[in-house]
Curated annotation (Swiss-Prot):
Name used for this protein in its record: Uncharacterized protein C2orf80
Region (Disordered): 155-193
Ranges of biased composition (kind: Polar residues): 176-186
Organism in which the protein naturally occurs: Homo sapiens (Human)
InterPro entries the record matches: C2orf80 (IPR038776)
Name of the gene this protein is made from: C2orf80
Pfam families: DUF5563
Coiled-coil segments on the chain, per record: none
Domain of life, per lineage: Eukaryota
Length: 193
């Protein structure tokens, strides 16, 4: 039992050390260096650790209360509510994704036209009912983007099939109407006297 606890503590300490080292090594205040995949992973790790601290209701947050007591009333920080914290977490991860995904891909996912591709066909938007809005589900955004792409392809196929069947039905009705008109023109008209 004690061995497991020591192993668990060592894992935690190593994880914390590696995370801190990554952040220290990747610190670039002037922003001259190009971001790499490791940078994105360090940002992702930081976002997840912050999210877990903020969203875990069993976490002992007495240090926040103690900090509030030391600060005078007019300078007391107002900590955001749960929804605002989730929004902050999502916006930080969205920034990471926006830096790693080309903007054209983002426009394709959401069905908007970029200025460079103004002649392309708009992609129909996926209904937001089938996508999860929970922060930890949204943190798997690349998978969500792939899912949205698949759904938009499916919806495009359905709309083209509907359009094709409606056009063929209209054409069939039009040819039927024309043939009935020709048939009525060839029939002798009977006058009732």
């Amino acid at each position: 039992m004690e061995r497991r606890l020591i192993k668990k503590e060592m894992k935690k300490l190593l994880g914390d050390y590696i995370g801190i080292r990554l952040r220290e090594n990747e610190f670039d205040p002037k922003g001259r260096r190009q971001l790499t995949f490791l940078d994105d992973m360090a940002h992702y790790d930081l976002a997840i650790s912050v999210a877990l601290q903020w969203l875990d209701p069993s976490e002992d947050l007495t240090w926040l209360e103690w900090e509030e007591l030391k600060i005078p009333l007019h300078g007391r920080p107002i900590y955001p509510n749960r929804r605002e914290r989730e929004a902050m977490i999502l916006s930080s991860y969205a920034g990471i994704l926006m830096n790693s995904i080309p903007i054209e891909e983002v426009f394709k996912i959401y069905g908007a036209d970029s200025s460079a591709d103004s002649g392309t066909i708009k992609v129909p938007r996926v209904s937001s009912l089938c996508l999860s809005l929970h922060p930890f589900a949204m943190l798997t955004a690349p998978k969500a983007a792939a899912y949205a792409r698949k759904q938009s392809v499916k919806s495009r196929k359905v709309t083209t099939n509907k359009n094709a069947t409606s056009i063929s039905a209209k054409e069939a009705n039009a040819t039927e109407w024309k043939s009935s008109q020709r048939f009525s023109d060839t029939q002798p008209k009977h006058k009732v006297t």
